[in-house]
Amino acid sequence: MSKVYDWFEERLEIQAIADDITSKYVPPHVNIFHCLGGITLTCFLVQVATGFAMTFYYRPTVTEAFASVQYIMTEVNFGWLIRSVHRWSASMMVLMMILHVFRVYLTGGFKKPRELTWVTGVVLAVLTASFGVTGYSLPRDQIGYWAVKIVTGVPEAIPIIGSPLVELLRGSASVGQSTLTRFYSLHTFVLPLLTAVFMLMHFPMIRKQGISGPL
């Protein structure tokens, strides 16, 4: 086993990387509120795991979506638990994200030289809200249907581009199969990919610049 480790160590300097990760200085003013971002990340990872598990059984069609969710809840082994954890962690992720944004703002974590960290964080907050909107429509129940109809109908009040924008969001003039397909694609592929990209930008900047000092 040591020979295998030595082989990787010689090429990748694993020990140096581990030492850098574990020996990072933590300022004395750091408290539990500085963990909110990490909790948000944990919730996201739970979302990815449970969401991936449900894609094996969920059917993104207007005729089968609701029935497939019911099947997950009643027939799939531990399906009720997986979906429940997905919903609970989604709510927790949004709450932790909001608290994290407030903590960073109130402690001045957005100021120079951390402007780009703040910008990527705001983008991640928007992506988190988008997860909520797109995910809400997937069960294709009454609450999800009317929520999506209202949310996608909001841009219609914008002069000139309002109606085309609504049609772009829905895929048609009304909420239907095209809307569900778009929201499913956004929820399971586009948004997770964008979130991963911005996290890979966000975390190295935090690592490089460190935690902002006390007020």
Curated annotation (Swiss-Prot):
<keyword id="KW-0602">Photosynthesis</keyword>
<comment type="function">
    <text>Component of the cytochrome b6-f complex, which mediates electron transfer between photosystem II (PSII) and photosystem I (PSI), cyclic electron flow around PSI, and state transitions.</text>
</comment>
<keyword id="KW-0813">Transport</keyword>
<dbReference type="GO" id="GO:0009535">
    <property type="term" value="C:chloroplast thylakoid membrane"/>
</dbReference>
<feature type="transmembrane region" description="Helical">
    <location>
        <begin position="32"/>
        <end position="52"/>
    </location>
</feature>
<keyword id="KW-0934">Plastid</keyword>
<dbReference type="GO" id="GO:0046872">
    <property type="term" value="F:metal ion binding"/>
</dbReference>
<dbReference type="GO" id="GO:0016020">
    <property type="term" value="C:membrane"/>
</dbReference>
<keyword id="KW-0249">Electron transport</keyword>
<dbReference type="InterPro" id="IPR016174">
    <property type="entry name" value="Di-haem_cyt_TM"/>
</dbReference>
<keyword id="KW-0472">Membrane</keyword>
<keyword id="KW-0479">Metal-binding</keyword>
<feature type="transmembrane region" description="Helical">
    <location>
        <begin position="90"/>
        <end position="110"/>
    </location>
</feature>
<feature type="binding site" description="axial binding residue">
    <location>
        <position position="187"/>
    </location>
    <ligand>
        <name>heme b 2</name>
    </ligand>
</feature>
<dbReference type="GO" id="GO:0015979">
    <property type="term" value="P:photosynthesis"/>
</dbReference>
<keyword id="KW-0150">Chloroplast</keyword>
<keyword id="KW-0349">Heme</keyword>
<dbReference type="InterPro" id="IPR023530">
    <property type="entry name" value="Cyt_B6_PetB"/>
</dbReference>
<dbReference type="GO" id="GO:0022904">
    <property type="term" value="P:respiratory electron transport chain"/>
</dbReference>
<comment type="similarity">
    <text>Belongs to the cytochrome b family. PetB subfamily.</text>
</comment>
<feature type="binding site" description="axial binding residue">
    <location>
        <position position="100"/>
    </location>
    <ligand>
        <name>heme b 1</name>
    </ligand>
</feature>
<dbReference type="InterPro" id="IPR048259">
    <property type="entry name" value="Cytochrome_b_N_euk/bac"/>
</dbReference>
<feature type="binding site" description="axial binding residue">
    <location>
        <position position="202"/>
    </location>
    <ligand>
        <name>heme b 1</name>
    </ligand>
</feature>
<dbReference type="InterPro" id="IPR005797">
    <property type="entry name" value="Cyt_b/b6_N"/>
</dbReference>
<dbReference type="InterPro" id="IPR027387">
    <property type="entry name" value="Cytb/b6-like_sf"/>
</dbReference>
<feature type="transmembrane region" description="Helical">
    <location>
        <begin position="186"/>
        <end position="206"/>
    </location>
</feature>
<keyword id="KW-0793">Thylakoid</keyword>
<dbReference type="GO" id="GO:0045158">
    <property type="term" value="F:electron transporter, transferring electrons within cytochrome b6/f complex of photosystem II activity"/>
</dbReference>
<keyword id="KW-0812">Transmembrane</keyword>
<feature type="binding site" description="covalent">
    <location>
        <position position="35"/>
    </location>
    <ligand>
        <name>heme c</name>
    </ligand>
</feature>
<dbReference type="Pfam" id="PF00033">
    <property type="entry name" value="Cytochrome_B"/>
</dbReference>
<keyword id="KW-0408">Iron</keyword>
<feature type="binding site" description="axial binding residue">
    <location>
        <position position="86"/>
    </location>
    <ligand>
        <name>heme b 2</name>
    </ligand>
</feature>
<dbReference type="GO" id="GO:0016491">
    <property type="term" value="F:oxidoreductase activity"/>
</dbReference>
<comment type="subunit">
    <text>The 4 large subunits of the cytochrome b6-f complex are cytochrome b6, subunit IV (17 kDa polypeptide, PetD), cytochrome f and the Rieske protein, while the 4 small subunits are PetG, PetL, PetM and PetN. The complex functions as a dimer.</text>
</comment>
<protein>
    <recommendedName>
        <fullName>Cytochrome b6</fullName>
    </recommendedName>
</protein>
<keyword id="KW-1133">Transmembrane helix</keyword>
<feature type="transmembrane region" description="Helical">
    <location>
        <begin position="116"/>
        <end position="136"/>
    </location>
</feature>
